């Protein structure tokens, strides 16, 4: 008996083709051929903790929207981050809250990076959340508030985070500013008004003599906060500045020494002048990019007590810098750095009260990718080399 249906020649041909395709697929699966797999667009980046809001909340989402590149971020102290790179942590982009920290740990006599770009400044500030500890803008002697034996001050540990040694530098500079009229920089800071200087000098000496220091001891302010109060458990050190707000909001500290940008981003109150600016003068807040003031910064160094020390580099303005790590370079790293140091990055940094440089400057420019060389200049001649190396 004949079957009720017989496939035509065309049908048999179709079946043969299908079987051939199946055979090829099985062959591919067996490993005889590997098709290219489309890689996701990702970038692994380290950044100083103080950039968590400007980058993590604002810049990175916009960068992802525009480029499709997903940015994996680690925020922490720049010094501890540099140690991670040295230990083999695979970051493509590294952003530091201190250009000298980046240079000394990742460029100088090392193989981790070969250039850096300085793109923003910042300022130190005195912050609080409890109005009980508010410092009135009309009150010029802020050092009394933070050095009382009964008040608790928090700062970052200088051995892990730049804001720690920058707080040390600020206190050392203030000590010189209020004690040494013979210093020509101090005279300039007071517009050569000796009677005004003497008002501050009298208040400084009267206060610190009560605490057991000699008259015109320029290190009294630094010593009281970072040695005496620390030993009395009324100065607390943390690993990174982004955790200082927790000390304030929990009541574990009355004041925190951190950046103006942190005060803005974390809704902290901070000491202001009568005109609404930073109450810590430019001569001590490390926010200057002025040759004369930066020379004043150089008179002190970053060294602290054994438990809060990173080295002895000269004082310098707070300068943020970025590089691409040599061994783990993502193809998207150059685009990220370019957008960070130009218009889009400048916009979001300014929103967080950083002070982005309208003209970023580079160190070892010839080692940079060509796209980045086009948007940087050499370091300005008025800046001491110690400010970025």
UniProtKB/Swiss-Prot annotation:
GO terms for molecular function: molybdate ion binding. Residues 1-29 form the signal peptide. Pfam families: SBP_bac_11. Keywords: Signal. InterPro entries: ModA/WtpA. The keyword Signal applies. GO terms for biological process: molybdate ion transport. Belongs to the bacterial solute-binding protein 1 family. WtpA subfamily. This is Uncharacterized solute-binding protein TV0544. It comes from Thermoplasma volcanium (strain ATCC 51530 / DSM 4299 / JCM 9571 / NBRC 15438 / GSS1). The lineage of its organism: Archaea, Methanobacteriati, Thermoplasmatota, Thermoplasmata, Thermoplasmatales.
